[in-house]
C-alpha cells in the first residue's frame, strides 16, 4: 500500500502504481472549507488530481490487460482515502455524501474515517471536551458499509433535518426503526 502525496509528480504516482497493490490519497478533511480552516496550505485540487490519475490508470490498465495478458498490473487492489472526523463542523450527512461521491466519481474501494485527536495546543485546533469522537467514527464506518455493500444512499440514512447519527444505535437499526412499514420481512423473499 502506497500513499500518494497531494501534488506529487504524476510520473512518480504512475511508477508507484505498478509497484503497489493499493494506493491512497488522503482527503484529510471532508470539505474544502474545513481544509482551508485547518490546513490552509493544502488545496482540494492537489488532492483530487492524483485520485483521478489513479482512477484513470486503473481503467487504462484493464484495457491493456485485455490486449496483453502479461502486462504489469496497476494498483490491483484499487484506491482509498481517509478523512479526519470531528476537527471541523461537518455533519455526518455531509461526510456520508462526500464518501458517496468519492465512491461514484473516483471508484474508490474504501473511505477510512479517523476520529480527530488533538496532539498539541495549537489554538487553531478545536477543543474536544468529550475526547475524540470514536463512537461517531464507528457509526460512520457502519453507515459506509451500508453504502458499499447494501446499496443505501446517504439520503436514505440521514438528511438536512436529521444530519447526525444517533450514536447509541447502529445506523442499520436506526433505519429499521424509522421504517417500520417495511417489516416484518418474509425471510425467503428478502
Enumerate the language-model features and the residues they cover.
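Helix-hairpin-helix
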Residues: 172, 178-190
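Long, charged amphipathic helices and adjacent flexible linkers at domain junctions
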Residues: 158-174
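Conserved AdoMet/S-adenosylmethionine-binding subsite of the radical SAM
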Residues: 1-157
Amino acid at each position: 500500500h502506497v500513499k500518494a502525496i497531494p501534488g506529487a509528480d504524476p510520473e512518480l504516482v504512475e511508477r508507484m502504481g505498478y509497484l503497489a497493490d493499493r494506493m491512497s490519497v488522503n482527503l484529510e478533511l471532508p470539505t474544502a472549507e474545513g481544509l482551508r480552516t485547518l490546513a490552509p496550505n493544502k488545496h482540494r485540487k492537489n488532492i483530487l488530481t492524483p485520485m483521478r490519475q489513479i482512477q484513470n490508470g486503473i481503467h487504462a490498465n484493464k484495457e491493456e490487460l485485455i490486449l496483453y495478458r502479461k502486462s504489469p498490473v496497476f494498483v490491483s487492489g484499487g484506491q482509498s482515502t481517509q478523512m479526519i472526523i470531528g476537527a471541523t463542523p461537518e455533519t455526518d450527512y455531509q461526510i456520508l455524501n462526500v464518501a458517496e461521491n468519492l465512491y461514484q466519481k473516483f471508484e474508490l474501494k474504501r473511505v477510512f474515517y479517523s476520529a480527530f485527536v488533538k496532539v498539541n495546543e495549537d489554538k487553531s485546533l478545536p477543543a474536544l471536551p468529550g475526547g475524540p469522537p470514536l463512537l461517531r467514527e464507528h457509526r460512520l464506518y457502519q453507515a459506509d458499509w451500508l453504502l458499499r455493500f447494501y446499496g443505501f444512499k446517504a439520503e436514505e440514512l440521514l438528511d438536512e433535518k436529521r444530519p447526525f447519527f444517533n450514536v447509541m444505535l447502529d445506523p442499520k437499526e436506526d433505519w429499521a426503526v424509522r421504517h417500520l412499514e417495511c417489516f416484518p420481512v418474509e425471510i425467503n423473499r428478502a
